């Protein structure tokens, strides 16, 4: 049997795996247990009452968190003409068409988000094998294929998170950093849950948001009592 590290022993002693924690208590616990030598992210896992094997029950989208994620996001935009100037003015680091595609083919991937105007998809489509596996392929459902590229750039910079359920029907994303205030983390989590509820598939039956857990990068998950969250029904 593998020997538990001192950190894991402390976590096991502090976190009750059978308990639903009030959101403020959960955040306080995460902060207490965050002892890594870097500022850890606060991640969330949301178990949804969907059948991920059915395409009409998959949940995918994006939402801007009110307090951002604490990450600096580099944005690449495929567009041209006036849209290119607007994207640059909005803060995009990389803007282009075929020239940008050639950079990516050459292995230059110094960006976190890719946005494209509809007329640029003929170029972006040829990069599917490169961008797809990295989760960077633009998609209308996440607002990254849009005629208004400037707004999409601003959203990405403001702390937009993209979400998509995995094969087990679970959404994984980040809601901030452990040095955020409890109010900031609570409001970010509430914004995410509200967005997920709005994205509920019409055919999904029964309890939709089944479980919500938050954790730090190096920590264990803490289950949240959803009654302590202020979210849309």
From Swiss-Prot:
One GO MF term attached to the UniProt entry: structural constituent of ribosome
Keywords per UniProt: Repressor, Ribonucleoprotein, Ribosomal protein, RNA-binding, rRNA-binding, Translation regulation, tRNA-binding
GO process terms (BP): regulation of translation; translation
Taxonomy, superkingdom: Bacteria
Keyword flag Endoplasmic reticulum: no
InterPro entries documented for this protein: Ribosom_uL1_bac-type, Ribosomal_uL1, Ribosomal_uL1-like, Ribosomal_uL1/biogenesis, Ribosomal_uL1_3-a/b-sand, Ribosomal_uL1_CS
Pfam annotation, one family: Ribosomal_L1
Annotated GO CC locations: cytosolic large ribosomal subunit
The keyword rRNA-binding is assigned to this record: yes
Quaternary structure (record): Part of the 50S ribosomal subunit.
Function: Binds directly to 23S rRNA. The L1 stalk is quite mobile in the ribosome, and is involved in E site tRNA release.
Protein family according to the UniProt entry: Belongs to the universal ribosomal protein uL1 family.
PANTHER family the record matches: 54S RIBOSOMAL PROTEIN L1, MITOCHONDRIAL (PTHR36427), LARGE RIBOSOMAL SUBUNIT PROTEIN UL1M (PTHR36427:SF3)
The protein, known as: Large ribosomal subunit protein uL1
Species of origin: Shewanella sp. (strain ANA-3)
This protein's encoding gene: rplA
